[in-house]
């Protein structure tokens, strides 16, 4: 039987240093956060919490500064993500904007869209949602029949 083996690795010192900062922030910010809310962190929307993450530079972390990002490493972003999820923090409000819509705007959006929207995402001010279901397909994106058609208008 084949198996995969991964050697343990260490994160760079700047990423591990960030871990302590994130844990301290979460301990303080979430001290009175009820366990029932923590259990629903994926659907929990807490605008104040999202804005606090944005103020610390923990949203849009890897994005260019010209669009409100912070040009941090993917490993630093990983540390923040790991700690926020482990704490049961409310990520539902900013998750799609920070991890899906924002990167898509950076890659495919117009300059005006990047300037107008991305900085607000990085500040935790915008909440996005995505619809990925229709009758007879559920969340199976490959079976969705709805299509977008570009027009001159």
What are these regions (language model features)?
Residues 31-153:
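Glycine-rich flavin
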Residues 20-23, 85:
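Solvent-exposed alpha-helix faces
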């Amino acid at each position: 039987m084949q198996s995969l083996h991964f050697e343990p690795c260490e994160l760079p010192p700047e990423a591990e240093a960030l871990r302590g900062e994130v844990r301290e922030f979460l301990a303080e910010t979430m001290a009175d956060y009820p366990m029932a809310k923590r259990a629903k962190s994926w659907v929990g929307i807490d605008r104040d919490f999202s804005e606090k993450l944005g103020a610390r530079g923990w949203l849009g972390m890897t994005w260019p500064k010209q669009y409100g990002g912070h040009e941090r490493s993917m490993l630093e972003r990983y540390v923040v993500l790991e700690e926020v999820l482990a704490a049961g923090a409310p990520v539902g409000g900013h998750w799609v904007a920070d991890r899906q819509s924002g990167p898509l705007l950076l890659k495919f959006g117009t300059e005006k869209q990047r300037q107008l929207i991305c900085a607000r995402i990085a500040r935790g001010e915008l909440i996005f949602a995505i619809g990925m279901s229709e009758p007879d397909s559920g969340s199976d994106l490959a079976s969705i029949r709805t299509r977008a058609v570009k027009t001159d208008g």
